[in-house]
């Protein structure tokens, strides 16, 4: 059954709390574009009955393609929650999946690895002691800067998949990714340390349990209700004029990353991962979040969602996490410091490296989405973080 999402219209009325700040929000985004924090952006705000959905700027600083509300952004690590966490929530609902199980129960090749004892619940809350990331591209680059032809090709073949517009990676490279993960060591188990490694394994976990590949499982369980407007590898079904580019990759792919996922590890997995890989517009992402948080949601049991979005780290107020989801953080005296002091403790969300963020606060009836490509043309300068653009937006909203 498909749910028809109501067309978003801008309802501006002085009756609503933050509508008077719309001009200030527009000014902040416009000024950020002038300062080259990002060339363009989409913003979606729903608070009570007030909805504001607007696009700003252009795909790049050459000002050729204007951002429209249906254009797609690389969501980066937001994928961890609206693909990875959602998939596992659905496993809990449909397959009685036990998140307290060690991963060796589902990955036989981890039985001899010390990582095999790590529990799913700890991996989702980033307290399993896994290292943050592995720089897989460095294993593919020769000393002279050329890519190793054993795994990378500039020709499409039956045994490879798209890495970028010009490059292809062998289908079997995932085995190399998993092998390197298995060789890592644990450090400070029980302490918070953000890690994306387990999220690279979730597609295989889903396939092992359901017999369905990760992308189809998500489409059938969630994205079909949004008319498949959240998607992996958008270049397959969308013109590039509707996909916002991310970065001019001068380290690995040596080209503008456009239509393929920006995250290198996810790209080496063919663009389909729970670590990164989803593309969406702000409106489509907000509609998914709205459906998720309905009391009688057709997407997931509300009790499961509540469990996954509750704080799992009880002894560290500076690092509050749900199961995949980010939470409001506190200092020792109880004051909220991230992402905003007026958000409730039950609120949750996530950010993405490409310059994306969403936050949901049921108590304040708030859904906030900001999508940008702040890594364009390069990731070197983090102006989005340094200028606290997201925090300033929340200040105006709340």
Task: Please report, for each region that a protein language model flagged, where it lies by residue.
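Bacterial Sec-dependent N-terminal signal peptides
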Residues: 1-24
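Short, conserved catalytic-motif segment at the N-terminal edge
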Residues: 22-75, 96, 179, 263, ...
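Residue-level preference for non-acidic, small/hydrophobic
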Residues: 29, 43, 48, 80, ...
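Short, P/G- and charge-enriched loop/turn segments at secondary-structure junctions
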Residues: 30-32, 72, 312, 342-348, ...
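Short active-site loop at a secondary-structure junction
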Residues: 31-42, 63-123, 184-198, 273-276, ...
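Structural recognition of the beta-strand scaffold that forms the well-ordered cores
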Residues: 42-44, 53, 122-125, 358-359, ...
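Short, surface-exposed loop or secondary-structure junction motifs
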Residues: 116-345
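Structured C-terminal helix/loop/strand segments within mature extracytoplasmic catalytic/sensor domains
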Residues: 350-398
């Amino acid at each position: 059954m498909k749910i028809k999402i109501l067309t978003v219209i801008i309802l501006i009325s002085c009756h609503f709390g933050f509508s008077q700040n719309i001009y200030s929000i527009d000014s902040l985004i416009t000024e950020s574009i002038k300062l080259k924090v990002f060339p363009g952006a989409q913003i979606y705000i729903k608070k009570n009955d007030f909805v504001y959905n607007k696009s700003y700027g252009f795909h790049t600083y050459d000002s050729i393609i204007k951002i429209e509300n249906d254009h797609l952004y690389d969501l980066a690590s937001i994928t961890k929650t609206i693909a990875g966490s959602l998939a596992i929530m659905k496993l809990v609902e449909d397959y009685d999946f036990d998140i307290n199980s060690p991963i060796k129960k589902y990955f036989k090749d981890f039985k001899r690895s010390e990582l095999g004892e790590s529990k799913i619940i700890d991996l989702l809350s980033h307290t399993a002691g896994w290292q943050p990331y592995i720089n897989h591209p460095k294993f593919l680059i020769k000393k002279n800067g050329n890519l190793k032809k054993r795994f990378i090709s500039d020709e499409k073949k039956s045994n490879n998949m798209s890495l970028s517009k010009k490059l292809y990676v062998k289908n079997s490279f995932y085995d190399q990714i998993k092998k390197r993960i298995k060789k890592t060591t644990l450090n400070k188990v029980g302490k918070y340390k953000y890690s994306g490694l387990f999220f690279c394994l979730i597609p295989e976990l889903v396939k092992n349990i359901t017999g369905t590949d990760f992308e189809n499982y998500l489409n059938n369980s969630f994205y079909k209700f949004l008319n498949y407007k959240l998607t992996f590898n958008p270049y397959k079904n969308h013109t590039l004029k509707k996909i916002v580019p991310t970065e001019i990759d001068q380290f690995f792919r040596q080209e503008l990353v456009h239509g393929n996922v920006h995250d290198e590890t996810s790209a080496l997995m063919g663009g389909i991962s729970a670590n990164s890989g989803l593309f969406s517009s702000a409106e489509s992402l907000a509609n998914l979040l709205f459906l998720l948080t309905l009391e009688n949601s057709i997407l997931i049991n509300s009790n499961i969602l509540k469990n996954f979005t509750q704080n799992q780290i009880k002894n560290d107020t500076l690092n509050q996490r749900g199961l995949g989801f980010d939470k409001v953080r506190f200092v020792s005296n109880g004051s909220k410091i991230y992402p905003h002091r007026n958000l409730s403790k039950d609120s949750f969300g996530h950010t993405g490296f490409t310059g994306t963020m969403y936050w949901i606060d049921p108590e304040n009836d708030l859904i906030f989405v900001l999508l940008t490509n702040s890594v364009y043309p390069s990731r070197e300068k983090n102006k989005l973080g340094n200028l606290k653009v997201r925090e300033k937006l929340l200040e105006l909203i709340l």
